[in-house]
Amino acid sequence: MRFVYPQGKAKALTFSYDDAQNFDRELVPIFNKYGMKATFHLNSGTLDGGIFIQKAEVAELYKGHEIAAHGVQHKNPTMLNKHQLVLEFGEDRKELEKLTGYMVQGLSYAFGAYS
């Protein structure tokens, strides 16, 4: 058995970006120009604030790329109890699904922290 990526490719390169900061407005068009895809890990609770992308632009800006949950407020998961974890990631997923119109399947822990 041999594992292959789309179009029969044997190797893959991934691009992964966190937090939906304003510079994504410049980054995403570069990916689009060269036909490249990326995963963007968004915090639904920080959207619309200061240095972050606006909720109203999420669906169009990230169209064709993967959106993944990253926690509503980017809290360190090692500092949360089970109930708080479910809320932090479950509510983020629900809100991102409303914004994108499709099922969000990916998840990236804030700070890369886990226990």
Question: What is the predicted function of each stretch?
Answer:
Residues 1-15, 22, 52-53:
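N-terminal pre-catalytic segment of deacetylase/amide-hydrolase enzymes
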Residues 14-17, 68:
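Generic enzyme active-site microenvironment
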Residues 17-19, 109:
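Short acidic donor-binding/metal-coordinating loop in glycosyltransferase active sites
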Residues 20-26:
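Short acidic, Gly/Ser-rich segments with clustered Asp/Glu that frequently serve as metal-coordination loops
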Residues 27-31:
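Short, well-ordered alpha-helical segments enriched in acidic and aromatic residues
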Residues 32-115:
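Metal-dependent polysaccharide deacetylase catalytic core of the NodB/CE4 family, i.e.
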